[in-house]
């Protein structure tokens, strides 16, 4: 592995610090703006030379963009697959930019600029994906950061824009504002009370969609759902953001009510189930990714319900991300087999819980 995480601002993991609102329920908020450079074919139709020129144009502009003044450029197209996977696991690049499946091989010119609180993916589905990632439920702060970046970068790079349709994008659902606002939210209460289907159906009726831990194409694991807007055309950024905020606040309220119902109607059963999850994590010698996510979901719920004390949400956030396969390989300094990763994952979790152990709340 060649990636040096010490070069990244805060290791690219400041969004894990549990500092935002409702951090026990909402892991993170992301605002992303899709932009294309005028005069070039969209990334999927562009030749290698065009994509490299897009990257060169952005690289030339960066010194004059205050939001990116201290950014680090990572050439994703020159990285080994494990490094690309690590960036994806850390939510710094998309699966498509990282080229992690046969449908989306890594493209020439694929890169990412990472700054303190914003980033720009280059040559993903669109030429540029501007993004801000925040801890907890912080859509206003995330939007303010990415809007500032958009304004600064737009003054240096000509974006493809149509007076009637707005910002032009490779996928028609992004045309208009080009904005995708998403919240990664933990909903075990609604799952356990079997209310989750109603909530998810309601999201779709209100023009929102849900996905798994890593967005489009990913499965729901550990009771984490990514809620986001579906389309952008015909609505302003403020309207899209306000709608998402109102709906997510309602979902948070529903989750909090479900947790109260669980404690009231099945207190001992739930407490036993969650402490069993903690015990497994504390002493298991091998854990698959899905096992770890599901047990961590239980412990996270227990911490939220104050059944377990002395264990921070920040630690749980780190366990969620850093116990994935590429992070384990990075820590070990070599590629791991599935069985080796299971052993390394269990050891990593045990050590973290031994350092910051939970006690009865």
Predicted regions and their residues:
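Long, Pro/Ser/Thr-rich low-complexity/intrinsically disordered regulatory tracts in eukaryotic proteins
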Residues: 1-164, 179, 193, 198-361
């Amino acid at each position: 592995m060649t990636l040096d995480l010490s070069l990244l601002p805060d290791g690219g993991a400041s969004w894990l610090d549990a500092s935002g609102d409702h951090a026990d329920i909402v892991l993170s908020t992301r605002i992303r703006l899709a932009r294309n450079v005028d005069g070039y074919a969209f990334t999927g139709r562009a030749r290698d030379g065009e994509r490299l020129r897009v990257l060169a144009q952005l690289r030339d502009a960066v010194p004059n963009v205050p939001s990116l003044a201290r950014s680090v450029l990572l050439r994703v197209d020159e990285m080994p697959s494990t490094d690309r996977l690590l960036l994806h696991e850390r939510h710094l690049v998309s699966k498509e930019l990282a080229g992690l499946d046969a449908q989306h091989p890594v493209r020439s010119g694929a890169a990412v600029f990472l700054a303190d609180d914003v980033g720009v993916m280059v040559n993903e589905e669109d030429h540029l994906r501007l993004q801000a990632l925040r801890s907890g439920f912080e859509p206003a702060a995330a939007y303010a950061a990415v809007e500032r970046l958009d304004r600064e970068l737009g003054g240096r790079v000509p974006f493809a824009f149509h007076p009637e349709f707005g910002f032009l994008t490779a996928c028609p659902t992004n045309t208009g504002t080009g904005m995708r606002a998403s919240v990664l939210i933990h909903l075990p209460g609604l799952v356990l009370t079997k209310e989750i289907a109603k909530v998810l159906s309601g999201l779709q009726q209100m023009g929102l969609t849900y996905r798994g831990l890593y967005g489009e194409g990913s499965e729901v694991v550990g009771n984490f759902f990514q809620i986001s807007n579906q389309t952008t055309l015909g609505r302003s950024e403020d309207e899209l953001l306000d709608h998402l905020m109102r709906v997510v606040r309602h979902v948070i309220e529903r989750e909090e009510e479900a947790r109260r119902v669980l404690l009231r109607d099945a207190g001992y059963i739930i407490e036993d189930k969650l402490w069993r999850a903690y015990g497994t994590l504390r002493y298991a010698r091998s854990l698959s990714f899905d096992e770890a996510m599901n047990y961590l979901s239980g412990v996270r719920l227990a911490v939220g319900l104050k059944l377990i004390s002395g264990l921070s949400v920040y630690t749980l956030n780190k366990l969620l991300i850093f116990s994935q396969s590429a992070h384990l390989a990075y820590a070990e300094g070599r590629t791991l087999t599935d069985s080796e990763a299971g052993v390394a994952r269990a050891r990593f979790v045990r050590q973290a819980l031994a350092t910051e152990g939970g006690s009865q709340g």
